[in-house]
Amino acid sequence: MKTIENHLSVHSNALNLRGKRNKILASNIANAATPHFKARDIDFDVEMRKKEKIGNISVNHEKHFALLSKVRPNDVMFREPLNPSLDGNTVEMAVEQMEFSENVVRYQTTLQFLTNKISVSYTHLTLPTSG
């Protein structure tokens, strides 16, 4: 039988990753006028596959920290600009705004899926059993 954590882990991992991506994209937009700022992003699909391979590692013994230190953080990449600016800044507002908007919609969709799963699970837990 799946635990609630396993039941919700894909959506919660996606929500966390989308939140991290929102912060990165917001930073890009905020630094659009900063000379030599390099636009950054993460590859959501690659990072989700990494999370699925790693799974949810629980720490219930002090020696488990050595294993956790080997887990790499999200790989942040630099975005290649279509039209490089003269000051070395690689932020292209149209691209960043489009990526941010798309990510926000996907974040909200993931949040809705997670909310629905929790609601359905709660309903199943509170239904009276027959017999």
Q: In which residue ranges do the predicted regions lie?
A:
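Long, charge-enriched, surface-exposed interaction segments in small proteins/subunits
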Residues: 45-46, 50-83
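Charged, well-structured alpha/beta interaction segments
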Residues: 9-44
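Amphipathic, heptad-repeat alpha-helical segments used for oligomerization and assembly
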Residues: 5-15, 75-113
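Extreme N-terminal "leader" segments
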Residues: 16, 24-27, 49, 53-58, ...
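Structured functional modules or segments
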Residues: 115-118, 125
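Conserved small/polar residues in nucleotide/adenosyl-binding loops
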Residues: 123-129
